[in-house]
Design a protein with these regions (language model features):
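Alpha-helical packing segments of well-folded alpha/beta enzyme cores
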Residues: 40, 71, 157, 161-164
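Metal-dependent nuclease catalytic cores that hydrolyze phosphodiester bonds in DNA/RNA
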Residues: 1-84
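Polybasic (Lys/Arg-rich)
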Residues: 162-177
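Mg2+/Mn2+-dependent nuclease catalytic core
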Residues: 58-156
């Protein structure tokens, strides 16, 4: 979805003519970001395992809708009323709102995909690093992570996101551009 927002034709080429799509080099920076994301997710697992409601959390939850939307949430929490909270894990020290790493837009897509797949989403959170945390010995997962509630921001973007998703699906259904 974010690829569509950055360059629609690039997404079309990737999905419709993948043999012509040039992935480009896999940079050291990209590898670093991916590795850090997995490390943060591991710290989140440690943190949640120490919580009384830790059993309510699942990792890598897949949302697949009948109209072709597909998303994987880093973490979800099942609430007592049957709804879920979506937690997106990021290696940043704050919520990123600008391009190209607009975490709110990414979370908005995840929420839309989850709801299209039949889930009721109650809350959306970006889990990021605490910029005030200073490591002293063993990493303290309780102090390392911040859960930023971005539900209201996602709610504000959901109509815009729905229109962008419709445009992306329309483009992907086009045989030639």
């Amino acid at each position: 979805f974010l690829q569509f927002l950055h360059c629609p034709k690039s997404l079309w080429l990737l999905k419709r003519k993948p043999t012509l799509y040039e992935h480009g080099p896999f940079s050291n920076y990209l590898q670093k970001i991916i590795t850090e994301g997995y490390e943060i997710e591991e710290h989140l697992k440690v943190f949640l395992s120490s919580q009384a409601d830790g059993h309510k959390y699942s990792f890598q939850t897949v949302f697949k809708s009948s109209n072709g939307l597909f998303a994987i949430a880093d973490c979800t929490r099942k609430n007592d009323d049957g709804s879920i909270d979506i937690c997106e894990v990021k290696s940043s020290t704050s919520v990123q709102r600008g391009s190209p790493q607009n975490q709110i837009k990414d979370a908005s897509f995840q929420r839309f995909a989850a709801e299209a797949a039949g889930f009721k989403v109650a809350g959306v959170f970006i889990v990021h690093l605490n910029s005030q945390y200073a490591r002293d010995g063993v990493i303290d997962s309780n102090e390392l992570l911040v859960f930023s509630d971005v539900t209201a921001e996602v709610d504000e973007l959901i109509d815009e996101t729905q229109q962008e998703i419709a445009a992306a699906l329309l483009l992907l259904g086009t045989l030639d551009i």
